Amino acid sequence: MDLKKDKYFGTLLPQHDKTPKLIILSLGAGVQSSTLALMAAEGHIQPMPDCAIFADTGYEPPDVYEYLNWLEKQLPFPVYRVMKGNIRDDMVNSVDHGARFPTAPFYTVNAETGKKGMLMRQCTNDYKIQPIRKKIRELLGVGYYKHVKKNVWVEQWIGISTDEIARMKPARDKYIINRWPLLELNINRRQCQDWFEKRGHKKPTKSACICCPFHDDAHWQDMKDNRPEEFADAVDFDKKIRHGSRNVKDKLFLHRSAQPLDQVKFKPKKEQYDMFDNVCEGMCGV
C-alpha cells in the first residue's frame, strides 16, 4: 500500500491548534492499534509518539500477551502496561462474597418475568480508560486530586479504521484530544492486515477479554474449535456469574441468546450483528 497516495478523511478529524505536551498511543495489541504502532515506528506516521499504553484487564487470551511481548521489542518508544485488577477474578469474587459487581454488558433474564435485557457496560471505563488516564496523569506529573493546567494538552492516538467509524468518541477529559491516524490515512482493517503481510510482521489476533459478551458467534465457534482451553474457561466463567451478586439479581449470561454458553448452537457470521463496531468504543478489540 502506497501511503502517499491515500487521501485524508478530513471532516471526521478533530481540528485543533494545540501543541501537545505528550503524544500517547492507546495500544490494545489487536490489528489496528498494532498497525498504528508499527507504522509510527517505521516513520509512516509522524511525529513519533512519546509512548504507548496497554491497559491489561488480566483476562486477555494468551496469544495477545505473547504478541505484545514481541511488539514491544519492535518499537523505539516505551510501552507501559497498566492494570486496575484482574477482571475475571474481580467478578467471580464479587459473586462469591456478595461484593459490588464490576458491571459488564452481560445478557440478563429476570427470574420472575423471564424478560431479557443487558447490563450497563462499565468495564471498558474501569479496566481500560481509567488505568490509561491514571498513567497519563502520572507522566504529566499531576497528582490524583490535582488539576491539569489549562494550557497542557495530551494527544491520544486510537487505532480505529474506516470500517469502525461508529466507535469514534471524544476523550472524557478536556486536556486529552483523541486522534485517529488510520482514518487520516483512509485505512480499513483489511488494509492493516495487508500491511502486515507485505512486511512479514508477526500478525496479531483480536484483542478482547475471553469473557467479552460482544463476541459474535464466529468468534465463539473459533474459540471452541481452536482454543478449547479458553472456551472451557469462558464456559466456567459463564456458569459462575449466573446468579449475579449483591447489586444484580437477574440471571446473567455471556451469550446474547441468554443460554448457557456450552449449550449455544452458534450461527454463521452473516447472521450476526457486530456489537464491537456499533457499541464498544475504541479501547477494546483493536
Each predicted region: which residue ranges?
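Nucleotide-activated chemistry modules centered on ATP-dependent adenylation/adenylyltransferase
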Residues: D2-V286
